[in-house]
């Protein structure tokens, strides 16, 4: 039976909601893919994520092919052309099928009179594809990052910026976290081998396993039984560093969607964990993850800047603060970040992080441990943030993560390793 939907028009709508309305893909896609088959859902995600990953290159190509950009109510057709170009350049979809489905998208979007224009632009690209792509390499669109972010990465990492951009522009690896309450990592690796799934352990993070070829979670042994969770290796490093112990009072602040909350409880199942996040909607994901893994924590809505409102005078042995940040370390997973963030956001985020860490510090017991983490690679949110905090608090002692002169540990995104992530482990003397 033929599908009653057109994936290319749905992708164009999703991209429009990201670029024109400032919504994230993760917020937009669930509603748009409700009535789509699993196979087509994977293709829709590829079209959306892929187009946003290489957006500047596609934009540059359109500028060479069209005298005027499509604006206003026609803007969604600009994105439809981008989706068409993405298929021709980056997918194995036969060109005739890519063209036919993309052109048909104009009818679904109620502008059938634009079919000729869209068809003409895509066919012209086919004729000039080799020449256009060669020319595209010689301008800044080749970097596939907005200019403000490119400048910040170059400034922060003069020797490594190109490797960072390359990693950001690739598809992310798929990492798993083995639930040590069910199996050791070596036991689960054996289960993967029996299921013909190739994987390898992370050299540092004790529960992390990388799949050589990503697969659907329903193919993973025991996924529905809670034997394993999909979580990036660098994110797993937070809990390894926190080192939670049974019987302790532990706060996971900015906890949604719950990956670190559940990791804490897998590492210390008798710990008393409070998971707090400001976003009530995202907290439902924390509850879902706890339920799937059959773990228990107290889950509360709360603003990290006002802890008295959600924990009163309670104090904690350990606090994990996965602070709100620019997410510049996870661009390969969320390419829409490149187009949703603005340069001015960085100073605003740094101010918010400072307010949260100041507010939560009094809630840590003497001798207690605070792990500050972000999925950012920008110094303003990381090393500079912690250096300023240590200067304000002589009772705060950095441990295991860098020195006072260069505080914290910065992971950079790597094709065969984890995402960009920063950690600082601090003891209250």
Swiss-Prot record:
Task: State a GO cellular component annotated for this protein.
Answer: cytosol
Name the principal localization, coarsely classed.
Answer: cytoplasm
User: According to the UniProt record, which cysteines are disulfide-bonded?
Assistant: none
Molecular-function GO term, any one: RNA binding
UniProt keywords (A-Z) are: Cytoplasm, Methyltransferase, RNA-binding, rRNA processing, S-adenosyl-L-methionine, Transferase
Q: What is its EC number?
A: 2.1.1.176
Per UniProt, subcellular location reads as: Cytoplasm
The residues annotated as the active site are 375 (nucleophile)
Provide the GO biological process annotations.
regulation of DNA-templated transcription; rRNA base methylation
Listed binding positions for S-adenosyl-L-methionine are: 254-260, 277, 303, 322
Q: What class of enzyme is it?
A: transferase
The reaction(s) catalysed by this protein are:
cytidine(967) in 16S rRNA + S-adenosyl-L-methionine = 5-methylcytidine(967) in 16S rRNA + S-adenosyl-L-homocysteine + H(+)
Going by the entry's taxonomy, the superkingdom of the source organism is recorded as Bacteria
Write down the Pfam families for this protein, in alphabetical order: Methyltr_RsmB-F, NusB, RsmF-B_ferredox
Protein's UniProt keywords contain RNA-binding: yes
Please list which residues make up the signal peptide. none
Identify the NCBIfam families for this entry. Answer: PRK10901.1, PRK14902.1, rsmB
> Which HAMAP family does the record cross-reference, listed alphabetically?
16SrRNA_methyltr_B
Family assignment from sequence similarity: Belongs to the class I-like SAM-binding methyltransferase superfamily. RsmB/NOP family.
Q: What does this protein do?
A: Specifically methylates the cytosine at position 967 (m5C967) of 16S rRNA.
What's this protein's name? Ribosomal RNA small subunit methyltransferase B
Taxonomic lineage of the native organism: Bacteria, Pseudomonadati, Pseudomonadota, Gammaproteobacteria, Enterobacterales
């Amino acid at each position: 039976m033929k599908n009653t939907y057109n994936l290319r028009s749905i992708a164009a709508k999703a991209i429009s909601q990201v670029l024109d309305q400032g919504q994230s893909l993760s917020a937009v896609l669930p509603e748009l893919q409700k009535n789509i088959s699993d196979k087509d859902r994977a293709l829709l995600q590829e079209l959306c994520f892929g187009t946003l990953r290489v957006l500047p290159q596609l934009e540059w190509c359109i500028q060479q092919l069209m005298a005027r950009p499509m604006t206003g109510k026609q803007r969604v057709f600009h994105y439809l052309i981008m989706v068409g170009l993405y298929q021709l350049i980056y997918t194995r979809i036969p060109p005739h099928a890519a063209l036919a489905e993309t052109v048909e998208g104009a009818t679904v979007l109620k502008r059938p009179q634009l079919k000729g224009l869209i068809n003409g632009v895509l066919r012209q690209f086919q004729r000039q594809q080799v020449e256009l792509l060669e020319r595209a390499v010689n301008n800044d669109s080749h970097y596939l990052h907005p200019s403000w972010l490119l400048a910040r990465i170059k400034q922060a990492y003069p020797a490594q910026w190109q490797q960072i951009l390359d990693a950001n522009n690739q598809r992310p690896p798929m990492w798993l976290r083995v639930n040590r309450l069910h199996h050791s990592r070596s036991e689960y690796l054996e289960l993967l081998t029996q299921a013909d799934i190739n994987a390898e352990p992370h050299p540092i993070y004790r529960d992390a396993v990388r799949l050589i070829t990503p697969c659907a979670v329903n193919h993973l042994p025991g996924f529905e039984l809670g034997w394993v969770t999909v979580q990036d290796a660098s994110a797993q490093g937070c809990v390894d560093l926190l080192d939670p112990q049974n019987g302790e009072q532990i706060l996971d602040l900015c906890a949604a969607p719950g990956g670190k909350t559940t990791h804490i409880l897998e590492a210390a199942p008798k710990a008393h964990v409070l998971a707090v996040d400001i976003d009530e909607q995202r907290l439902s994901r924390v509850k879902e993850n706890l339920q799937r893994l059959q773990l228990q924590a107290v889950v509360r809505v709360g603003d990290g800047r006002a802890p008295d409102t959600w924990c009163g005078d309670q104090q904690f042995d350990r606090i994990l603060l996965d602070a709100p940040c620019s997410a510049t370390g996870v661009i390969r997973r969320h390419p829409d970040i490149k187009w949703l963030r603005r340069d001015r956001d960085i100073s605003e985020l740094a101010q918010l992080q400072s307010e949260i860490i100041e507010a939560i510090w009094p809630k840590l017991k003497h001798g207690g441990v605070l792990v500050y983490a972000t999925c950012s690679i920008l110094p303003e949110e990381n090393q500079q943030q912690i250096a300023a905090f240590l200067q304000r608090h002589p009772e705060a002692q950095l441990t295991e993560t860098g020195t006072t002169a260069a505080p914290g540990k910065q992971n950079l995104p790597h094709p065969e390793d984890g995402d960009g992530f920063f950690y600082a482990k601090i003891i209250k003397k």
